[in-house]
Amino acid sequence: GSTRRGKRLSVLTSLALSALLPTVAGASTVGGNNPYQTYRDFAENKGQFQAGATNIPIFNNKGELVGHLDKAPMVDFSSVNVSSNPGVATLINPQYIASVKHNKGYQSVSFGDGQNSYHIVDRNEHSSSDLHTPRLDKLVTEVAPATVTSSSTADILNPSKYSAFYRAGSGSQYIQDSQGKRHWVTGGYGYLTGGILPTSFFYHGSDGIQLYMGGNIHDHSILPSFGEAGDSGSPLFGWNTAKGQWELVGVYSGVGGGTNLIYSLIPQSFLSQIYSEDNDAPVFFNASSGAPLQWKFDSSTGTGSLKQGSDEYAMHGQKGSDLNAGKNLTFLGHNGQIDLENSVTQGAGSLTFTDDYTVTTSNGSTWTGAGIIVDKDASVNWQVNGVKGDNLHKIGEGTLVVQGTGVNEGGLKVGDGTVVLNQQADSSGHVQAFSSVNIASGRPTVVLADNQQVNPDNISWGYRGGVLDVNGNDLTFHKLNAADYGATLGNSSDKTANITLDYQTRPADVKVNEWSSSNRGTV
């Protein structure tokens, strides 16, 4: 087929259908008057519970309308972790999650369709509250972080200021019938269910809130859900009526007296402290200097510096196997220039560019780290290759132009903004911007400067997808890797692009089982 300028084609193949089909699964104690699947769909934003949906009707098991979700648009639960131990943590920053510190066992989290696994490098436990905000090894690309409330506890407890509370979790599964009897469904951590909580929260000490839900669960909500064992760390979202937004209010800590849900609050002061500890001092480029920032790094000590004239900025990267030793760097100043003199292994440290920058190297130095954030209206010309087995994670609304030389053996995972692949050929004519490209979250666009930048079969669309702008280039796909209907092919060029889908099975791809020469029936 072909695609002309401005055309966007949704990409979905049978290879991806399995990711869309529901499986038998559920979370916590829920009311038995409603279909069990309703609670699952609610927690997974499936069916009528798409994020942003309004005035959602709720029907009981008899198909009778029992009410509407009309206090707020449907919350987006995508910031809640999935796959292993789903619901135990929520993304609150591109590199940090929130949960309870008594959750000691989990070491990694996944989001969206669970394609990527993010490893915890620092647990960041609160000194007194049942709360921790672990740091991850990479910037998350599949989803956007939840907004953590900055409201006072008094405001959170005021129903006129917080008109709705929704929860999700994967604790031990029970259904309570209309007579109050609980029926066991399955153990915890299998899948998410969720529901609506009343607005009658009250104080739990100085760092938490609690909610009474004793008696029959049906008395508390038209879609009731009560946390159980295994729900620890699961999120409580509240609708801020003044700001018109959902906010993460707290994380589930436990149950008091068998009737009270207890949530730990997330102090903004604690978050600021944690984030600050992981940042090096901002780096400022002085355009009047006439020289680039010279970036040196000593992998044996995990330390380095960026120097321009008499100005020098210290930086910290991975030290031995300690990824958390890597600190984040933010670059300020217009039309900045950075020259890598050594390969930099920044560990869990990320790079944030607030303005236009060019990053280059004259000796083939490479960079690895948590990823790159390019702020809105900024453009970064990235002329540095990665390494095999590592992926460059890119987020931020700005543009990253990849313009290195030769074959880059590293991969790309992009979750926001624009990435232009314009890798240049080396002296032997070899060119590859990335070994693989993953487009996720529904926010990003990847633009191809030509059809040599990446093997089309190594391009994939993750959770909620994004746009692959073929930019007038002809491409042949032997397979399409799309997690859902968010995958899009676009063409911003005036030139028509021909897209060939060649699914013909090659003889080498066919596996043949042969009988052994003994003729005794053994394969």
What are these regions (language model features)?
Residues P292-T330, G415-T418, S427-I439:
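Acidic Gly/Asp/Thr-rich repetitive segments characteristic of extracellular carbohydrate-active
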Residues Q95, G398, G417-V419, G442-P444, ...:
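Glycine-centered positions in the ABC transporter ATPase nucleotide-binding domain
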Residues S28-K62, G87-N103, L192-S221, S225-Q294:
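C-terminal subregion of chymotrypsin/trypsin-like serine protease catalytic domains
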Residues G1-G26:
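Gram-negative bacterial Sec-dependent N-terminal signal peptides
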Residues N60-N116:
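Catalytic histidine site
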Residues R135-F226:
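Chymotrypsin/trypsin-fold serine protease catalytic domain
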Residues K104-A144:
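Conserved H-D interstitial segment of serine endopeptidase catalytic domains
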Residues A325-G404, V446-V523:
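Extracellular, surface-exposed repeat architectures
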